[in-house]
Design a protein with these regions (language model features):
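Cofactor-cradling patches in redox/metallo enzymes
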Residues: 22-32, 36-123
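ATP-dependent carboxylate/acyl-activation modules
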Residues: 1-39, 50, 127-132
Length: 132
């Protein structure tokens, strides 16, 4: 039986229009053999969760800035509500250290700040997939 590619949702939550980081991560993951569903900008928590359900995603990647912190809280609540806690959420972006701690405490699997290595990102996503 063939093994399917790890499927990843990549999104920017809220009104964040800084696409470079998310696009770089999407490209890194595609080049590494992942199946990437790129949702783009202006995504709500509900849109991200719906995409994860529809696409049967293994991992959710969210790009955000500190001002969108509350939306990640909403995202994590929806993930719990839809019983998707086996789908890891990985965040990246320009996030203050205190908010990184809060995101991790809320259930975000990992936060990658600017300057994180591409190899580390790919390796982490590969290790977090719930099924391959």
């Amino acid at each position: 039986m063939p093994v399917r590619a790890i499927k990843v949702i990549i999104s920017m939550i809220g009104l964040d229009s800084h696409t470079t980081g998310a696009e770089v991560v999407a490209t890194l993951l595609r080049d590494a053999g992942f199946e990437v569903v790129y949702l783009g900008t202006n995504q709500t928590p509900a849109m991200i969760v719906n995409a994860a359900i529809e696409e049967d995603a293994d991992v959710i990647g969210v790009s955000l800035h500190a001002s969108n912190f509350a939306l990640v809280e909403d995202l994590m609540s929806l993930i719990e509500e839809h019983e998707l806690t086996d789908v890891p959420v990985v965040c990246g972006g320009n996030i203050p250290p205190k908010q990184i701690e809060q995101l991790l405490a809320r259930g975000v699997a990992r936060v990658f700040p600017p300057g994180s290595s591409g190899d580390a990102i790919v390796e982490y996503f590969a290790g977090q997939a719930r099924r391959t």
